[in-house]
């Protein structure tokens, strides 16, 4: 996506790039869920693997035949803190395991949880030590303390990920265990979610470019209201007599809210940080967005 960024926006306007980026990513994610379910119904689940292999072969064939072979000057990867990178990865795996399986272990009534907490503290201490004493750490401490609003943005990301955990707890348990919907029926729900994703991207692009340029707070309020509407509908509409059609609107609201809030947080982070630290801040953002926030929300529920 970075290679074709200038095709999308020659001025590198992130309020244009981020909405278009989310359309491509979320379309692929929803299509994958839909395709894997139907391949499993029509034939064999291995067909999805063959499809992915075929797509990769087409991409490699295109790169071989249509792209000019050109390389920039070789730059050695000196000065990268590989040890801290491994420690951050280990910390994420430890936190994900703790938050996912602590309930199965009955939390602090089992010795495994206490051992895991001890290893998490050791890993975190090693990360903080290297962050303060290594010349070029993997995540610079200035990411958290050198820019205004970064900590507020990361805290809001974590909070909203907790709220989105309803999708994994209430929605999935209700649809699978109470309503006993099949895999195909659950896969069909990807369509209203995808529609909400695309609508959220187009609305965010229109809002930031035409209505109130750079007005992230108001756009964030719109996304928050859509998330609140999804949560209220999912809590109040839960009933064994619920029809499938009644689920389309809350699922649309979830897709719209997820996309809008993601664009707001990424664009806000880009504006408050300089180029040298933005990708480190983006790494922390994705750690919370993709791993810690959702796992913590599920654990709290």
Model-derived regions: residue spans:
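Alpha-helical transmembrane segments of multi-pass secondary-active solute transporters
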Residues: 17, 47-52, 112-116, 186, ...
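Interfacial helix-cap and linker-helix signal at transmembrane-aqueous boundaries
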Residues: 34-44, 99, 175-176, 207-208, ...
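Transmembrane-helix bundle of Major Facilitator Superfamily
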Residues: 1-60, 247-253
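Structural signature of transmembrane alpha-helices in multi-pass secondary transporters
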Residues: 17-29, 84, 88, 160, ...
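Membrane-interface helix termini and inter-helical loops of multi-pass transporters
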Residues: 39-41, 72-74, 99-109, 173-181, ...
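Hydrophobic transmembrane-helix bundles of small-molecule transporters
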Residues: 43-154
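Cytoplasmic-side transmembrane-helix entry/capping segments in multi-pass membrane proteins
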Residues: 13-24, 77-86, 143-145, 216-222
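12-transmembrane solute porter fold
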Residues: 139-301
